[in-house]
Amino acid sequence: MSLLKMPSMIFSFHGGWDELIRIPPSIARMFARVVLPLSLLPAAMIYYAGGNYGDVFVPGVSPAQWHAAAAIFLVAELATVPVMAWLIHLSSRVIDAPAAYRDCFTIAAIAPVPLWLSALVLFIPNAVVVAAVGVLALACSLALTYRGVYTLLRMKEDLLAMQMATVVTGAGLFAWLVLMQIVLVH
């Protein structure tokens, strides 16, 4: 799967989703080719932005604290994806639509891509712009979760897929807020 197909996956149930159904990637492949490299992006941007103009975001935090927060953020991000996959897997069983863990991991690996890419906005030292892009990325992540749940888990009802995507995104939002708190408090 190419990241170039990501925009169409936000708005369509086909495109990249059909490719993932036709040629399902292994968990190791998704982790190595999507999760690991893209998880490095927010940590690197926190390291850069915090070291250069961290006072714009949180006054009084030293560059060394930003650098430590970036490392903690990376570890937390890498741990969050398998936890989210487990949550999707558990949710699929609760609504009586059991899914393979591999499909759940694929959704958990693809859904945060907009959030990871949104870290590039940290090149702009403006908290309002960063927040606006973060909200847009969150909306795209919700759309990817919904379309991924509906398509990869072969859901038959829109409402159940939306319900599951909302629960998973809510948990993901909570995890994201915890990660942001790690960055801001550390």
Predicted feature descriptions by range:
Residues 2-99:
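Selected alpha-helical membrane-embedding segments in polytopic membrane proteins
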Residues 18, 52-55, 96, 147-157, ...:
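Juxtamembrane transmembrane-helix termini
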Residues 30, 54-58, 127-133, 158-160, ...:
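Short alpha-helical linear motifs
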Residues 36-45, 111, 169-176:
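Alpha-helical transmembrane segments of multi-pass integral membrane proteins
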Residues 48, 52, 124-125, 182:
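Helix-loop junctions at the membrane-solvent interface of multi-pass transporters
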Residues 79-83, 137, 141, 178:
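Hydrophobic alpha-helical membrane-associated segments
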Residues 89, 98-170, 174:
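Hydrophobic alpha-helical transmembrane segments and adjacent short intramembrane/lumenal linkers
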Residues 174-186:
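Juxtamembrane boundary at the C-terminal end of a transmembrane helix
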